[in-house]
Every structure is written in structure tokens, then in C-alpha cells.
Amino acid sequence: MPEPVAEPALNGLRLNLRIVSIVMFNFASYLTIGLPLAVLPGYVHDAMGFSAFWAGLIISLQYFATLLSRPHAGRYADVLGPKKIVVFGLCGCFLSGFGYLLADIASAWPMISLLLLGLGRVILGIGQSFAGTGSTLWGVGVVGSLHIGRVISWNGIVTYGAMAMGAPLGVLCYAWGGLQGLALTVMGVALLAILLALPRPSVKANKGKPLPFRAVLGRVWLYGMALALASAGFGVIATFITLFYDAKGWDGAAFALTLFSVAFVGTRLLFPNGINRLGGLNVAMICFGVEIIGLLLVGTAAMPWMAKIGVLLTGMGFSLVFPALGVVAVKAVPPQNQGAALATYTVFMDMSLGVTGPLAGLVMTWAGVPVIYLAAAGLVAMALLLTWRLKKRPPSALPEAASSS
């Protein structure tokens, strides 16, 4: 974890601008993810002639690479400092675009072209994990650990913004210049971000002795489990709300997803100091309660307006879960291990979103679409119970106490 630079307290607009000036590098990394997201599946299936399996695999490779590389990103950020990790990650984003460019050049040889696309996706996954983890820690190093919740919140906001912008922009780039035009756009975004990052002052890495990975995992896994359980609600909304609306014979699934995103971002903007004022565990429990109500409304909805209110509440509830639990998880380890703690904690969300889709699909096939929202509400209720138990544990039994001993 970087050591924050000693300077006067930051407040309000100045604080937010300071944070945004760093998390914009995470925005750039997610923009390089969003740009090809709506293009590559169709390109692999229609233009290259491969099956839907290969089209899906090309997209999934990035997520697997992110999942496997994230703990290493946190560890290296603790040792080398977050700025170097961000630049390294952005270089990976640049190389992913170069991989797409080579795939376009090799389009006469479909297997080679597919291999180059897959390589680009793997490099992108590694780059995103490093740029995302590093930008959070860099932001904390700039504004101080008191504002870690706000830094994490802003990272989520720019992530959603980049993905929302990237997909339609990528379609336009592909329509304009084919895969080559898309690749050059990805490379241009990453290169611009690298050039903006290099002159920025770095923050010092903490020189303390790092804990082994197993020790870090032991101190954050309960918070990660609560996050994983709560992420199921987000997963079933994002993946299956369209099928839910189709099963009901309703229109407006896209608007429901828009409501979720607006609620997610709006809640983070409206309550930037909620975690500092109430505490991470308290905020998480409130959020779980709101998310449960939202999922129950969706699962039992008899009218479209009920489902839309449910989706809105689910977005509001899930919005602050990650930063609220993340603040507590990061403080459960010494400063020199907080990068590893943040990365390890994030892995639980990655894994949850990875398994929610197929498991919910099996449940949906067996019991119908609405049941998955009721099941997700049950999982979030388990997260609420787990967090309540964590709050009730005596201080001597909490990971934070152990980390300071």
C-alpha cells in the first residue's frame, strides 16, 4: 500500500477532482474493455465463421486473465508502488489493441487470427487488473486512507461510465474502419493514458515486510464472502433481466437496466461520506436490506412497474456494498499489505459473477425465471447475517485487531 503524501486536508470538489485525476486511468482501461465488447463476438462468429462457443470464449478469456492476475497486481503494487503498476496495466491495454490489429492482418488465416485475438484478450485482462488495482491504491496514496471509500466509489463510477461509452463507440469505430479501426482506437486510448500517467508524481511504496498470500486471504475472506453473496443480486439482474421480461411478456428490459445503472451511480454520488460517517459494516448492512427488498420485488412482480422499482432498489442497495466492505477489508491488514488485501477481496466478486450466470441458468431451467431473483435475495440475506456476525464479534477476534498485533 502506498504511503500517503502529507498535505492539508482535502474537502468537497477539490477532493473529488484529485481522485478523478487518478481514477481516470482506470476509466481508460475500462474503455479499452468496452470498445470491443459489442464487436468481437459478432466478428468471431459472423466474419470469421467460428461457432458461438469460440465467440464466447474470446470474451471470457479476458475475465479469466483478470481473475488469475489480480492478486499479483495487488502484491506488486505494494512492493513497486501503484503508479508503475498502472502504467504496466495500460501498456497491457495497448498491446491488446495491437493483438487485434495483428489479428486483422492475419484474417486470411482464421486460426492464427483467432489465436491473436485470444492473446490480445488475455493481455487485456492482465492489464485491467493491474490498472484497476493500481489506480485505486494510487488514489488512496494521493488523498489519504481516510478517503479510501470515496476512491473506491469513484473507481466504480468511472468503470460504469467507460463501459457505457465504450460499447456504442466501439460499434461506430468498427463500422468506420473495421477491426483495424477498432484496434487503432484501443491503442490510441491506452497510449494517451500512458502519456498522461508518466509525468504524474508517484507515491512511495510502503517498505514493510509483506504478509504471505494465505495470511492476507485469512484476514479478508469473510468480507469477500459477504461481497460474493451480495454480488449474486447484481449478476442475475445484469444477465437475466431481459429473459425475465420476455417470460412475462413485457417490454422495457433495456430501460430496467438503465434504471439499475442510474441507481448505482446516483447512490455513490449522493452518499460520498456515508461510509466514513456510519462505518463500513453498518453501510453494508443497510445496503443488503435495500438490495433484498429490490430482489424480492423483482421476483414477485406482477406488473412491470413493480419490477422496475425492484431493479432500482437493487441498484441502490448494491451500489455501496463493494466500497463499504472494502474499507473494512483493507484495514484488516498492515499498510504494506493493503494492495494485496484489496486485490484478494476483489477476486471474490470476480468469482461470484463468474459462477452466478451458469448456476442461475440451471435454477431458471428447473424452476422458472422469477425464482432466481428470490434465490439471490436469500444469498444477500446470508451476506447480511454474516456482516451482522462480523459486527458483533469482539474486537480481539476481528482481523483488524490481529493485523495490529
Curated annotation (Swiss-Prot):
Residues spanning the membrane: 19-39, 48-68, 85-105, 106-126, 129-149, 156-176, 178-198, 224-244, 252-272, 283-303, 309-329, 344-364, 366-386
Domain of life: Bacteria
Keyword line: Cell inner membrane, Cell membrane, Membrane, Transmembrane, Transmembrane helix, Transport
Topology class, membrane: Multi-pass membrane protein
PROSITE patterns recorded: MFS
Subcellular location: Cell inner membrane
Organism (species): Salmonella paratyphi C (strain RKS4594)
Molecular function (Gene Ontology), one example: transmembrane transporter activity
Protein's name according to its UniProt entry: Uncharacterized MFS-type transporter YhhS
CDD domains membership: MFS_YfcJ_like
GO terms for cellular component: plasma membrane
